[in-house]
Amino acid sequence: MSTPIVLRGMTWDHPRGYEPLQACTAVWKAQHGVDIVWDRRSLQDFESFPVEDLARSYDLIVIDHPHVGQVTREACLLPFTGALESIAQGSVGASFPSYHWRGQQWALPIDAATQVQAWRPDRLNQAAPDWDTVRALAREGRVALPMRAPHSLMCLYTLAAQLGAPGRVEGPELFDADIGAQAITLLRDLMQDVDPVCYTQDPIAVFEHMAQPDARIDCVPLIYGYVNYAWQDFRPVRLAFADMPDLDGRGPVGSALGGTGIAVSAFSAHVDAAVAFACWVADADAQRGPFARAGGQPGHAAAWEDDAVNAAAGAFYRATRATLDGAWIRPRHDGYMPFQHAASERLVAGLQSGESAATLIADINRLFRASLPT
């Protein structure tokens, strides 16, 4: 009698990150006899921890797309081959191609996210339709914006794209100097009316505060969507989500894409079993079924368009789909991840010190040039 296969997986430490994978694992084990033990890492570690180190300890790893250039150099992940058409065609927005790099597919999207708008439906009649409305709410002390690294840079990316000049991922200059400076000025003007604690907060911290009855925050114009907070009774106050506010008449285009994909370690002793689970959990049946029911934020359109999935989440998916479909893929070259952290910290320091927008965008562009492969 053969020994049952037990895989090890690593995901991120939030109910959205681990509960759907645990639920899907239970279904998979019942069907195929393969178990998976999931460990977790903090959100900050998730964005910065070396993937190669994880690949030497785990069979399955949840990653985000800016890592793909680094993992290609490290040769620590196994590229997916074979029939992936169902997953590719069902991908929401650019989620599937965001993990395609140098001719190979390094992960399969299981979670789709981008910067959208969060709001309090118990106190606002509708989400803020445009940036002028956001500014008016901010002057009343009713707006927050997560600015802890890397989210400060994500806001800059999104605003620059909304102004008509998305980041140039191939370089050499990441931001158009004039548009980048305009985006920094927009950020600075907003942050003057926002509690400075936001410089220390990531999206989860903002949501946890916003979902309390006595919180003053009614609108967060740019924040990575978390479907859990749109559920009834997840927190004391149920939040609503919408497309990001319009800026300059261009609609909800250019939001900095987030989300996660599932990858297979090149060092796994059970490659076939790991690949089989990854392909199943990223496809339609699992995504709109056990993955969504357990609190996941699926990456497959079958879930985003499903009536039952939307009903449970206050129409989260339909309300933010246009922003997700118009989202922008961040740079992914080897060397990008250190840049992302350094540029985020540099941006916050410049905003807090009152440094000129032109000087600040020039320095961020300098950091980006230095990160590019030679």
What is the role of each PLM region?
Residues 3-15, 34-40, 60, 143-144:
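Short, well-ordered beta-strand elements
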Residues 171-202, 244:
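Glycine-centered hinge/linker elements that transmit conformational signals in sensory
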Residues 193-269:
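Extracytoplasmic/periplasmic substrate-binding proteins
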Residues 108, 115, 133-173, 179, ...:
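Extracytoplasmic/periplasmic solute-binding protein
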Residues 33-91, 218:
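Extracytoplasmic "Venus flytrap"/periplasmic binding protein-like
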Residues 292-342:
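Long, aromatic- and glycine/proline-rich binding clefts that accommodate carbohydrate-like moieties
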Residues 66-116, 126, 241-242:
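Hinge/lid segment of periplasmic solute-binding proteins
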Residues 325-374:
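Conserved C-terminal helix/tail region of periplasmic/extracytoplasmic solute-binding proteins
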